[in-house]
Amino acid sequence: LIECDEAAFRKASEFLPVECLVVNNIFRDQLDRYGEITHTLNAIREGITHIPDAVLCLNADCSLTASLAEKIPNRVVWFGVNVPIYTHAAHELSDAPYCIHCKTEYQYDYVTYGHLGGFHCPNCGYGRKTPSIAVTQILTAGADASDIVLDICGREYDVHVNLPGGY
């Protein structure tokens, strides 16, 4: 298991025998290194071209991450959160408010954080994929831990997460 910087992944993927790639999300926090979100996205996309046999585990809640599944031969496994994490989530803080394809503003059934959530474009139809691994309920959300219901391919599990907040 290797956690790799987005820009380094572009090159590292040429030399490592990658079996599985997990991409959680793409946020503007990479701007100090890459200048713009599209550069980060393109670095990951280029790296994926070197690993056509790897399984991609992609966050269905992130419109940018989800776009990585387009025009690739890789098998994709989707994960996500099917319910709002925060009742006060502010969509206006979005790093990606507009459709990556047609530039129409996304509509959301719910927002989990920033631009993550149940997004869809009312113009071209691009939208969140149905995840096979998903948080379906948040039972408790404490300062130190949370209890959730996790659905994995149709089977539900009660899970205690030893992390604070929406992690």
For the regions a protein language model found, what residue spans apply to each?
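Conserved substrate/cofactor phosphate-moiety recognition/catalytic segment
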Residues: L1
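Adenine nucleotide phosphate-binding catalytic loops in nucleotide-utilizing enzymes
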Residues: V77-Y167
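Flexible active-site lid/hinge loop adjacent to a nucleotide/diphosphate
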Residues: C4-T112, G165
